[in-house]
């Protein structure tokens, strides 16, 4: 009997470790002009969506931020207007930080007013944002291959030679970054540890699951499930049909939100743990 219990426990453990994911589409919201990034606001049960509404590298004043309800209905299409090419977002102390080409905006979530405009010297294509527990902002520049650090509204280069630096995420006070076709962990001494490599296209959005696995999107239309040991498989491959830009994940609901960029929509997928 004891042996049977041990065998059963082995298979349960093996199954958990071998667990794969799949996606089931829940809803899609259209008529969102060039959505680049989605951010879950758990307290308000809403989604922030950065809208480029034009070219991703031009200061044209067409960009903005929309708010969706949790069911995908549009709460406020024009919550913030007059930005250029807004991309990655993060919230700290009720301030929404938004990367926009060469500046980072701080937007008061209660009033929708821009209360901070932080210039990032020599920046060209600021892309994603992550904020640590101390409120220090980190922002990637995909074109200059750098990660910048913003503290007390002052910007400085934190790390350079990070090829096509894009998606950022703090996990247990450690910074992870998508660098071209790789997922890297940046140590406290700025040493780099390779977590995964061989992404078919350059990485864009980065999210983490409760079990420590990652979900990674590639702008070209691929979404991966990546395990801490670097093994990966495709959850979605829609290349040539739509983009999969800077994703967001609601761990409580197990829902993945995907901005489709040129598809002008946001798609919600249920994440199934098989």
Stretch-by-stretch model annotation:
Residues 50, 99, 140, 178, ...:
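Residue-level marker for isolated small/hydroxyl-bearing positions within beta-strands
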Residues 50-72:
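Beta-propeller domains
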Residues 53-57, 103, 144-145, 182-184, ...:
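Short glycine/acidic-enriched loop and turn motifs that connect beta-strands
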Residues 68-72, 108-113, 150-154, 187-191, ...:
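Short loop/turn segments that connect beta-strands within beta-propeller blades
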